[in-house]
A protein has these predicted regions:
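Conserved mixed alpha/beta catalytic, RNA-binding, or beta-rich assembly cores of soluble enzyme
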Residues: 15, 185-203
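Short beta-strand segments
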Residues: 7-11, 49-50, 89, 106-113, ...
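Short acidic, glycine/serine/threonine-rich loops at helix termini
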Residues: 18-20, 57-62, 119-125, 197-201
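Histidine-centered active-site/metal-ligand motif
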Residues: 50-52, 198
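Short, ordered loop/turn segments at secondary-structure junctions
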Residues: 11-13, 20, 52-54, 61, ...
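Ligand-binding beta-strand-loop-alpha-helix segment within the catalytic cores
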Residues: 65-185
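N-terminal glycine-/serine-/threonine-rich phosphate-binding loop
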Residues: 1-49, 59-64, 178-183
Length: 203
């Protein structure tokens, strides 16, 4: 019977903490620290997943600010962007850490989709906080001017919230299983994966 994989889940806030230095270089530094902590798992099937709250919030904000120059990006495309960028960081840092420890293994970051139900009530009731924190006055200005949905987050300030529908299945599940069986370290389902309503294109 195949050995079950070790699943490691990294929080998006751990890589880009509120109020911290969150440049790409700073996020690389934190990801590198994490990768070194995973070296002892090099002999086991290893699946790494990650959150993306701060990162996808930044991607949406960047899209909103540039909307007069280039077409705005929908949420699912921004999630895919963060899967690619954060997956790249994890690939690089895991490869470097494993190689330095003399335990080199192939690593693959996989853009992952989950099927969700079009009628999921989460679409009408956004609840997942993303991006940075705002003072109440700025949050209310954003809600009025930019039609953001925002809510107060545990006394720390206001944050943008987006829908988080329940996944029905992981589209790439078989590919993930095949990669793990082949000894590949897999980075997958970042940001809980890109939501996809079967039979529909885009959002």
């Amino acid at each position: 019977m195949p050995q079950p994989p070790v699943v490691v889940a990294l929080g998006g806030n751990a890589i880009a903490p509120p109020g911290g230095r969150n440049s790409v270089a700073a996020q690389f530094e934190r990801t590198e620290e994490t990768a070194w902590r995973l070296v002892h798992l090099a002999d086991q099937p290893l699946l790494v997943t990650h959150g993306n709250g701060p990162q996808v919030g930044t991607a949406l904000l960047r899209s909103d600010l540039a909307a007069e120059v280039v077409p705005a990006q929908p949420l699912d495309a921004c999630v895919a962007d963060t899967q690619g960028g954060m997956g790249y960081m994890l690939q690089q840092c895991l490869d470097n850490a494993f190689s330095a420890a003399g335990r080199r293994r192939p690593t693959v970051a996989l853009v992952t989709r989950t099927v969700v139900a079009l009628g999921d009530p989460a679409f009408e009731h956004p609840s997942k906080p993303i991006g940075g924190f705002y003072e109440e006055a700025e949050a209310r200005r954003r809600m009025a001017a930019d039609r953001w949905v925002m809510s107060e987050d545990a006394g720390r300030g206001w944050r943008r919230v987006v829908p988080s529908p329940e996944p029905v299945e992981i589209v790439e599940e078989e590919a993930i299983r095949d990669l793990l069986a082949a000894g590949v370290v897999v980075v997958a389902a970042g940001g809980a994966a890109c939501r996809w309503c079967a039979g529909r294109t885009g959002r």
